[in-house]
From Swiss-Prot:
Keyword Repressor part of the UniProt annotation: no
Subunit structure: Associates with the intermediate 315 kDa subcomplex of incompletely assembled complex I.
Localization: Mitochondrion membrane
Organism of this sequence: Danio rerio
Protein name per its UniProtKB record: Complex I assembly factor TIMMDC1, mitochondrial
Primary localization class, coarse: mitochondrion
Amino acid sequence: MCTAVRQDLSLKCGGTDVKQPGDSQPGHLRALLGFTLPSVYASDSSTQILPKHIGKPEFPDTGWDRIKDLFYNVEGQYTEELRNVVKSGIASAIVGMIYGGLPGARHARQRFIQCSQAEIYRNRVDAVRAAHNAAIRGFLRFGWRWSWRVAAFVTLFNTVNTGLTVYRDQNALSHFAVSGAVTGGVFRLNLGLRGLLSGTIIGVILGFPAGVLILGLQNLGGETMRDKRRRERRELHELRVTEWNARLKVTDDLIGEMSSLKHQDSEIDLQQVEELLSQPRNGNAAKGPYNQ
């Protein structure tokens, strides 16, 4: 039960005091700070601030925007450039494993046979099995050494080349040269400054023929990777613009419907008020108790 108390202008509801806007501030806080604080009430607070406008989707025309598009896809899938980098890394790892493993297995088998001339086996099957086991160990040992090195080299090369191509939005042989220089320098960095310079020079020399080969294969396909990516990006931008226009149209239609409904409601309310005012007054209700 709520009771109004005029002395302190407070509303007491079940033992809880609810201060009115005209109440004074707490004495403890005023005594602590030494000055009065401005009062803020719920009725004075503004509604949630909404954005003034919904920005129109912009075409990613800068290098960093295109770089960010490599790692962001509306469909939640990886872009084709990243998939190509991963595929090339896996393929180079397999090639490196085969390239280093086969000679390593042959060398390990021959060395095992040479070192096991004085060893006695129970039968020929045990001797052949031991030689095969040595060849397998050699294949895995030497194949792994070549596999991760070739995979790292190719992955770093393709990563730098893809980054430069996407950032500048064009295919150029200089990108392959720079990629080869960076990759060769990194792989020869443990040899010091001379190794860094020699690796950079070798990378530049090998980057040009690799670029000519890759660009030639892409041109034979009728469409380069950059042209395909540019076309897909343009189509995606047009799709976003179309979706944005559709949402904007729906918003305008909704605002128009709300305005029309509000106008109709106000007219109905005004008509009801006019009808009430036009009705005759009740004579019995107009007479007071003292007029009887």
